[in-house]
Amino acid sequence: MTLVLGIDSSTQSTKALLVDAADGTVVASRSAPHPPGTEVDPRTWLAAYDDATEGLLERAEAIAVGGQQHGLVALGDDGEPVRDALLWNDTRSADAARTLVDEMGGPDACAAAVGSVLVASFTASKLRWVRDHEPETAARVRQVLLPHDYVSRHASAPGTAPFTDRGDASGTGYFATAAGEWRPDLAAAALGHDVALPRVAPAGSVAAHSAAGRVVAPGTGDNMGAALGLGLLPGDVLVSIGTSGVASAVTATPVADGTGSVTGFADAQDGFLPLVATVNAARILAHQARWLGVDLDTLSDLALASVPGAHGVTLLPYYGGE
C-alpha cells in the first residue's frame, strides 16, 4: 500500500489526511487549530503542521500542501517573517487595491495583465498597504511567499528554495495567469522595491524532498485543490460555503473580466479556474440560524421552502466588509 499525506492549511486549522494512493481511502487523519483573526504569526501554521502530521508523516511516501490563498507572508534577509501574515480576509488593503488598479491603467488593463481585477484580498494589495503604512517594515522585505508556499518550505528538507504552483500564484496580483509567469515588476511596484518570488513548480512534478527523503509535491491553493480533488470537468460548477463563499468552474482558456465580477485564476494543472467569491459566507448562515432560533439544517429547509426573492426580503451580507 502506497500512502500519501495531504495537508490543508486553511484559515482556521491544519488538517492532515493519510490516504491510500491506489483508491483514495482515508487511512488516518489529524487536525490542529490556527489562531483566530485576519493577521497572525505564520509560524503558528508550522506548529500546527507539526501537530497535525504527528504519527502520520513517517507513514507517507509523498506530501502535498494545500493552503488558504492570497495571504502575505513577508520574509526578511534571514528567511523569517518580518511581520504577522495578512490573511485573505483582511480587508484593510481595499484602498491600496483601488490605487494599484488605477496605476495599472484601470480594471480592463489590470485583468488583461494578471487575469483579475485586484481587490483587498490579493497579495499585491497587501504589499502596497505595508508600503504605505509600515514603510520601515516594507524596506526589510526580501522575499514574499503565500501560506501554502511557507508551509511547503517547512515540509521540505532544510535549505530547500521556496516553491509555489501556478494556481496559487495566480491569486497574487503579480502573476501573468494566461502566460503562466511571474510579473516581478508588478510586485516591485506594489512594495516599492524588488523582491524575491518562489519558483513555480510544474504540476505533477517533484518539487522537493523532505529531510527524510519523502517526495514533496508542488501543492496549490485551496480553491484549486478543491477543483482538482473533486475531479471538476468543463461544464461542472463547484459551490463551496466556508469562511468564504465560492462558485468556480474549470476551463481550457484564461478569463480576464474587467468588471471584476469573475476572478481569472489558473487551476492546479494546465487549465484555468474562473471563480466568483465573497468573504462573507458561513458566518451569514450561522447568524441567520441564530436569529431564527434554528440549526443549519432547518435553515436550509426553510430556504428551500421559500420562493425566489424571499417575498421581497433583502439581506446585505457584508458583515466583514468585502
For each of these PLM feature ranges, what is it?
Residues S10, P36, Q69, G76, ...:
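Acidic, glycine-rich active-site loops and adjacent beta-strand->loop/helix elements
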Residues R30-H34, A201-A211, G320-E322:
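Short, intrinsically disordered, charge-balanced linker/junction segments flanking boundaries
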Residues M1-D84, A112, A212-P218:
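N-terminal glycine/serine-rich phosphate-binding loop of ATP-dependent small-molecule kinases
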Residues E39, A96-T99, Y174, S210:
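Short, charged, surface-exposed secondary-structure boundary motifs
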Residues L5-G6, A94, V101-V114, F122, ...:
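Active-site core segments that coordinate phosphate-bearing ligands/cofactors
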Residues G24, I63, D90, V130, ...:
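Residue-level signal for inorganic ion chemistry
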Residues Y49-A62, H133-A138, P184-D194:
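Phosphate/pyrophosphate-binding loops at sites that engage ATP/ADP/AMP, CoA/4′-phosphopantetheine
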Residues L57-N89, A113-T123, H148, S152-A176, ...:
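Short beta-strand-loop/turn "lid" adjacent to the catalytic site in phosphate-handling enzymes
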